[in-house]
């Protein structure tokens, strides 16, 4: 299991991934992470993982903000978090959870990122990414 967060707010333009500078907990070796990056590699083959993500998001302009968990560069639509911002500076708490089964073939790792999948720049406060191998 790994739990990541960041010690300061992040401003993410459309398409940018959150980076994490704080590892709250890391047990075992089923996930790899380089501090300061935004990617967690799921290294166990034919495994099942629970992925939880969230934080407080606000748009730098009035409109809809979107934060999404990506797997290997593709959005996981079931792990998409939307927030309607009525005024600049408003923040909303968002969170999602999903599951992933990794490939059983070859020496393949799955890459998990948390990305601004919207059309407006967002401010992300207290982000958290928790990944736990369950089988």
Where would I find each of the regions flagged by the language model?
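Extracellular jelly-roll beta-sandwich "head" domains, especially the C-terminal globular C1q domain
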Residues: 1-44, 48-135
